[in-house]
Amino acid sequence: MGFFGRVTRTFVLRDGVTGRHVGALFFVAFFSVPIAGFVGVVQPFTLTEILRIPFDQQGSLTGNLLVMHELVNLSLIGLYGAASDKLGRRPLLAAAFLIVALGFCLFPLVSGQVALVMFRLIVACGVAGITSMLTAVANDYPAEVSRARLIAAVF
């Protein structure tokens, strides 16, 4: 029996949810977590080597970018949650990945601080959707008895 058969033995799932659904959830989670952290990892290189921003100015710019990113996340997570009840989780999750992909495609075009802010705004909009939809789906799939176990495995 393959991977998906073992998943359903490990977790008690809600009616209509199969091991394939859980496998897809793990697949999405596997890519979501690095996507959310990618910007922070490459930012020092971007500021130093691409934009040539002096080291003494990088701290304030990084702080401003992080605050802006978090404000976008906080303002959009509730909207994504409300929209997911109307439109469904899968279309919004796909749209969020496309928004992040758009931001990453624009990343090589960053030529100054304004472009960097725009890049971060686009990525923040997508990351807000990914994190809120991933959390919602992770809560939708398991039965109550194994909810904590599945959420711990996903995150």
Residue map of PLM features:
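Residue-level signature of mid-helix packing/kink "hotspots" within the transmembrane helices
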Residues: 69-78
